[in-house]
Amino acid sequence: MSKRIEVYFVPADGREPAEVLAAKAKRAYVATGFNERIAEGDFAALKVHFGESGNTGHVKPGWLAGLIGEIGQRTKHAFLTDSNTLYVGNRSNSIDHLRLAWSHGFTPEATGLPVIIADGLIGRDKREPRSAQARTSSSKIAAAILDADALVGLTHVTGHVQTGLGAAIKNVGMGCASRAGKLEQHSVTHPRID
């Protein structure tokens, strides 16, 4: 019999005030008990998608206040992170990516945390951990993700052309990959309609 996995769900509506959503996110996070696993001095990555230019369908910085406060009680080395995109645009290099994040309010002044683009200036900062248990023998992961001692994913739900739904698994699976890792993931799958 497979192990039962607990899912924590808090109903939320993007039209609710940021303080209400921050309290709800904190409540769900605290319920997981994950914060107790973060040690003083740990590097804690808060993996978010900073949105696209002109986009409003992403997690807002104000919604993170409760989580950031909880994590901040455990370590002073927390940071917001994402990796560069494979496609050309405002998130394909760290300079434009940071400017976009800042324009959406993900600034140290607003959140209390720095933003680190996990795969470096142009997406080449990567490592290739190997595993006999994984579907592939190695994966190309953004270096700062592997340097972190803890990873907390903060995800919005979207439609996705290949999977039908993009959410937590895509935020971590694709969002923690380097550009080479993203290319590898996209090159081995092809949409099929039955």
Q: What do these predicted ranges mean?
A:
Residues 1-194:
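N-terminal and secondary-structure boundary signal
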